[in-house]
């Protein structure tokens, strides 16, 4: 896909439409882009490479944009293989290229390329706030550790006011896919599942970015952002501070034979009847786990409904709670509905996991259903729905 940035700054990335799982776990039905950029000046700088899955098309894009010139510098923003995977091919094409990274970059580089033929004279180690002149363009480097790896750095090109933001502001989806839900949907799913654990480092990076005059954001996944940048930065501020983006309730259920599912659907109806405008109901056995995690962070309230299983909770609920725990889920109100036949254990298991998370308010009553939802269960469900609707 053709992407216009400026006369001197060229997009040379690739779309991957054949990948089924990003990082071997996140479904990407509309593919993903691996973004790479070229800055043409007195010196030529390449901003990251791409996954080896796209190396052939990337090489064609690179050579076409160079039009006979050579790459002087490779800026290594992030060493993850979907961005650094083609460094070896670049060095084959341009043996005299100089790699630019930080101390952590060069510490980690041999773990991925143990025989990369780049000597110390072809490495530049940069630190916070240092710069590299290409001629009329100047690259300014800012460290972004744990956004979302320790070696990550972003680059601000001051003449055209471009922020090369590494994985920040990235999203799922090939560049030629027009998402009917807009940028935020797949950017949110990407953020909370890839970067979500690292809210404090993202906040630190946003503070650095606030001091820069940014007119364009060039991420390593997803579209180049040029307009209404305050909208995107505002969302990142909300997400990284773990504030709910919207008022609403996620009802996530784990059902073995369909009885807990019926209770969850009934509970969702109760919430809607009480005026809750946004209620998202997710089946943890079948729905995309990354999307459920996304909704958990998006809304201010959550209700978990699960069957008891092997003295604990049905595994897909345990898996979901593990995802929330690992992504630093916090600052939310949660209700619990458990189901069990001879010894309900789901409720206390879910409660125990939730209690390990920061600032989670678990509300009463906890509803216990015995095997199937009955008329006698409805008053307790209504009581919980009242609490959740008014929380």
How should these model regions be labeled?
Residues 3-64, 154-157, 161-165, 260:
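Conserved beta-strand hairpin/beta-sheet module of binuclear metal-dependent hydrolase folds
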Residues 3-7, 101-152, 198-204:
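Metallo-beta-lactamase
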Residues 38, 154-218, 223-253:
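Metal-dependent phosphodiesterase/nuclease catalytic metal-binding core
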Residues 42, 53-100:
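Active-site metal-binding motif and surrounding structural segment of the metallo-beta-lactamase
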Residues 86, 288-292:
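Short acidic active-site motifs
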């Amino acid at each position: 896909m053709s992407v216009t940035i400026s006369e001197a700054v060229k997009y040379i990335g690739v779309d991957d439409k054949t990948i089924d799982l990003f990082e071997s776990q996140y479904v990407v039905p509309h593919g993903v882009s691996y973004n790479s950029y070229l800055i043409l000046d007195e010196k030529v700088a390449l901003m990251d490479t791409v996954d080896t899955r796209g190396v052939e098309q990337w090489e064609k894009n690179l050579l076409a944009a160079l039009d006979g010139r050579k790459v002087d510098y490779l800026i290594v923003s992030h060493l993850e293989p979907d961005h650094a995977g083609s460094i070896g091919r670049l060095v084959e094409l341009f043996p005299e290229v100089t790699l630019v990274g930080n101390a952590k970059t060069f510490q980690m580089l041999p773990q991925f390329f143990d025989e990369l033929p780049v000597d110390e004279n072809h490495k530049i180690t940069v630190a916070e706030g240092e710069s590299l002149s290409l001629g009329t363009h100047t690259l300014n480097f800012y460290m972004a550790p744990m956004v979302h790896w320790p070696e990550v750095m972003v680059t601000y090109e001051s003449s055209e006011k471009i922020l090369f933001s590494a994985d920040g502001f990235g999203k799922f989806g090939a560049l030629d896919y027009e998402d009917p839900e807009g940028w935020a949907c797949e950017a949110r799913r990407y953020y909370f599942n890839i970067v979500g654990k690292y809210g404090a480092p993202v906040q630190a990076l946003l503070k650095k970015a606030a001091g820069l005059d940014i007119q364009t954001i060039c991420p390593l996944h997803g579209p180049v952002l040029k307009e209404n940048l305050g909208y995107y930065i505002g969302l990142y501020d909300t997400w990284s501070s773990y504030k709910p983006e919207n008022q609403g309730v996620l009802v996530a259920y784990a059902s073995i034979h369909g009885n807990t599912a019926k209770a969850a659907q009934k509970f969702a109806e109760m919430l809607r009847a009480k005026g809750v405008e946004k209620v998202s109901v997710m089946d943890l056995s079948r729905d995309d786990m990354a999307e459920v995690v996304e909704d958990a962070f998006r809304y201010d309230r959550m209700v978990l409904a699960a069957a008891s299983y092997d003295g604990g909770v049905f595994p897909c609920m345990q898996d979901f709670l593990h995802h929330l725990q690992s992504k630093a889920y916090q600052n939310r109100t949660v209700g619990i509905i458990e189901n069990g036949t001879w010894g309900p254990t789901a409720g206390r298991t879910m409660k125990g996991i939730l209690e390990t998370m920061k600032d989670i308010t678990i509300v009463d009553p906890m509803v216990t259903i015995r095997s199937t939802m009955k008329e006698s269960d409805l008053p307790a469900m209504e009581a919980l729905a009242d609490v959740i609707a008014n929380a």
